[in-house]
Amino acid sequence: MNATNHPIRILGLDPGLRKTGWGVVAVEGARLTHVAHGVIAPKDSLPFAERLLVLFDAIAEVIALHAPHEVRVRR
């Protein structure tokens, strides 16, 4: 928990150019609670730069919606 005793939200990302998975959990003490999850899948027909822009915009939207305190990225 953070200093105000509210759950900490963590955004996890499983990156990929074809599909990027994401999930948000809330952590309160030893308790984890699922908040939301999804997959971002830019069209394969898009040029590389446009696929990156789709990923950027979608991840920015997830961050704006769920306001995570931390982000973890899978290697």
Predicted regions and their residues:
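Phosphate- and other anionic-substrate recognition elements at nucleic-acid/protein interfaces
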Residues: M1-R75
